[in-house]
Amino acid sequence: MPARPARSAPVALLHTSPAHIPVFDALRDADHPGLELRHLVDEELLARARREGPDAVAGELRAMLAGAVAEGAGVVLCTCSTIGAVAERTDVGVPVLRVDRPMAAAAVAAGPRVVVLATVASTLEPTVALVEEEARRAGRPVEVRAALVERAWALFEAGDTDGCAKLVAEAADAVTDADAIVLAQASMTSAGRFTTTSVPVLSSPRPGLAAAARAAHAAAPAG
């Protein structure tokens, strides 16, 4: 008899753009068939966090996550790097993960010179802090530099995802003195299709979803 698929708890994904839904659904189908994803989208969370700072959305975030848990989610994955730290420290009784933590750990493992690229300025500081946190956790030295890819976010918001990705790829290809390039936002992932640099270009959706899947299997009810 074929092996039964491993049981897992539903995963609620908190997005600040609906564009992330097909990305994570495709990764689920390719890497984690049978994993139940429940998508929550609130674009205003990012807009407010950009205006007032990530902590300004803590109350709304807690309410959304508590609602997802009340409806049966066993794990929450926040796919927005700007508010990821706020989400991660929200106690709703189930694991709350930020999508970019596994990517940050991989960047630290690649070497001490890490370049963070972002298309939204509010993402730079949280991502740099995360890489530095992972370096302390690993006991490794790290030098993190950060750069904003100008005009790319406007293209993304206008629906020109390829145009955004190509600008990000150009910025990545201009980096030569690094051991890893971190694409700070999940929305930047497709830039990997256009890069030619020999420096590893890391994105968050695949390793982030893998971490959520592991947590979902661990949280599944027995039987």
Protein language model features and the residues they cover:
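Non-catalytic structural scaffold of enzyme domains
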Residues: 1-223
